[in-house]
């Protein structure tokens, strides 16, 4: 086998499908780990939340990964603390085959003098794949903000956007102004489901964003899209938004993420996979391989596991 061919197979880690109903080896692109006792804490977790108000560490996640055929994981930082960028790298360093990379968080620092030195230091580790931006954006869309995004692209890193703080139209403008930057919107663009047809204005903004070729969409936190919990587990409740995402982004720009352990508030990991497969399996095994594996590797570009 040539060196180039070996590299490609190693990078994508493709697993042949023995039969039509088998999953490809999964790269789950949205898993959170946290130590609830760390000084910065996680302000979005309520004290009385019996599901999430505890630590979720690699040992908790690894058993789930083994059970469900997850060959790779992208860990997304759960909070906005700067030290947690390094903490996530450190806590997953023991198992680089599973923990392919880290998406940190620079929500409070991007566009300030503190961004560049810390970001460049983190980029010395090839498993640092980029960062997520969340929170309020209005005061941040400055020349310095865009300069930091261009530096991010120059370093070959990507940016996840948690919508809500950043509106879809803002991300569209960012994608236009920094076309070399790889952008991934989380959780189907932050759509909120209530059993009614999707709002026409939101659909228009979503489609406009999808026209930017450097923007990808994460099919993640499906159960969390519902305003009222527990969320329905019938695929019919999600077909409209999944049809929209598939038509808008196409088969090469959709990426799977579970949002574990936040999903535990509604359903277990098996239910997340079952729901996602219920929709995408009918599109054929080639599409499933892209959604669950190839697109993640192509977007995040994690180092080849050894």
What residue spans do the PLM features occupy?
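Bacterial N-terminal signal peptides that target proteins for export
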Residues: 1-9
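Alpha-helical elements of Rossmann-like donor-binding domains used by nucleotide-donor carbohydrate transfer enzymes
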Residues: 60, 87-90, 117, 121, ...
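Short catalytic/ligand-binding loop motif for oxyanion handling, primarily in non-cytosolic enzymes
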Residues: 35-36, 82-85, 111, 192-193, ...
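Mid-to-C-terminal alpha-helical segments outside catalytic/metal-binding sites
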Residues: 4, 19-29, 52-72, 243-244, ...
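Mid-domain alpha/beta scaffold segments of enzyme catalytic cores
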Residues: 21-155, 161, 209, 236, ...
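Active-site metal-binding loops of divalent metal-dependent hydrolases
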Residues: 31, 78, 188, 258-260
